[in-house]
Amino acid sequence: MTAQHSDITATSAWQKLHAHRDETSALTIRELFAADTERGRELTLTAGELYIDYSKQRVSRHTLALLVELARAAGVEERRDAMFRGERINTSEDRAVLHTALRLPAHASLRVDGHDVVADVHRVLARMGVFSDRLRSGEWRGATGRPIMTVVNIGIGGSDLGPHMVYRALRHYADSGISVRFISNVDPSDLVATLADLDPSTTLFIVASKTFSTLETLTNAANARRWVTSALGEQAVARHFVAVSTNAERVAAFGIDTENMFGFWDWVGGRYSVGSAVGLAVMVAIGKDSFEEFLDGFHTIDRHFADTPLEDNAPAILALLGVWYSNFFGAETRAILPYSNDLGRFPAYLQQLAMESNGKSVRADGSPIGTTTGAVFWGEPGSNGQHAFYQLLHQGTRLVPADFIGFAEPTHDLPAADGAGSMHNILMSNLFAQSRVLAFGKTPEELTREDTAPDLIAHKTMPGNQPSTTILAPRLTPSVLGQLIALYEHQVFVEGIIYGIGSFDQWGVELGKTQALELEPALSSGNGSLPSDLDSSTASMIRWYHGVRAHGTATVGRP
């Protein structure tokens, strides 16, 4: 049995960590800092433009050495190298995993099954660049001869979460006068609200679906098509729709000129695809040069991950810290706390990246996993979160490791309330303060010295000892955003290697899709006919639904 498919919990490295946890579990972050005056300077990493402080973690230098030993026992370096070589490490689908090829420079070479994938990638990027230039310059015109003013991306999952997050993060780099919107949910209110104030004659849709058969995407695309053709006629489809897909036959049947179809490959998973043609809407907004900088940022961290020893390898160290808390301290969630409103959708993006990748209960060989996997990722931008859920982080009973993300230079800055100072300084002072309070808290003795009323000391005591990592960068640029995304991509991969998981499939998503397709006719028929194998709960809910839809009243019947 290969290392990545074996039971990591049976290794001596895992057992050493268990014993170490038992020996040191009472040790606090406050005590770790008191014992090591250089800790705050030395437990840091630099990867590209990212400065990463992980000193406020419940780990000693010996803990870190044991975690690196675990990574080597799991074969992290071997699996990493196999991925970069283009080996078929996605074994359940018999595919290579080559999102890293999307950001290789044009002069690089990577051959898979005798084929140069870098040349393929740059051919598509060049076509995207030509198209985005035509749109941005006004050369591309709609059916009435007017230039396009709004691009609407229709996709779901990785075809929405990635480009939507990136567009919001980099919207200050948008310089074409073209706004971008996103439709993903099959709830019709999403499409209706998005199109409410748009003009069909100046709107272009990007329909992103690899197979051009995704139910939610094609349902929304069909309604967008009706919206366009009812105003402009059938001939308008070719001027107001383009596709990100590999199914030329279905794209053509929809009415899209296949010259305006931009492909990507089976070796790119949806949640890793924002650097491919799936990012076309982003390129239209920020231009091909800024998009190239975005890809260069990914590549910077790809090289760091590929070339740096595990002891100083930022994605590997952060992944190992995640395993430490999930599997040795029982932490179930991870808070993502960007102190940047522009990164407002970054936690949701990471939810898919982490939870779809490692939310598995069997290893890549199909055998059951003997430990916890797949932490729940969640979060909100600071300082909003401080007035929502930080109370639980500071004084609750749950262990919640957190990642703070901040920038030295703001996209925009304004003076403080008194007309002086800097709003950005206020924002960042909150980041630094929150990470400090989470780590060190406030003791009863400190409160007593501050003359706190005795009956309030217990209420105001902050236990501290909540671990956090702080990731800082000079400024949120296209390159830095690419670096941040790649940092988390490779973290997720390393965690998956340690668990023996196949991190690049998502079979759990498929069954719900299949059953929805089977149930939809029962909802549409309205005649009370239900599949004979339905459970009583689902049958009762569908009957209630029929009653309300037909008569405006709820009628709950027995199956």
Curated annotation (Swiss-Prot):
Pfam short name (any one): PGI
Sorted UniProt keywords: Cytoplasm, Gluconeogenesis, Glycolysis, Isomerase, Plasmid
Cytoplasm among keywords: yes
Membership in a protein family: Belongs to the GPI family.
Location(s), subcellular: Cytoplasm
One biological process term in Gene Ontology: glycolytic process
Cellular compartments per GO CC: cytosol
Protein name stated in the entry: Glucose-6-phosphate isomerase 4
GO MF entries: carbohydrate derivative binding; glucose-6-phosphate isomerase activity; monosaccharide binding
Catalytic activity annotation: alpha-D-glucose 6-phosphate = beta-D-fructose 6-phosphate
EC number(s) from the headed UniProt entry: 5.3.1.9
Annotated catalytic residues: E356, H387, K513
Keyword Plastid carried by entry: no
Record function comment: Catalyzes the reversible isomerization of glucose-6-phosphate to fructose-6-phosphate.
CDD domains: SIS_PGI_1 (cd05015), SIS_PGI_2 (cd05016)
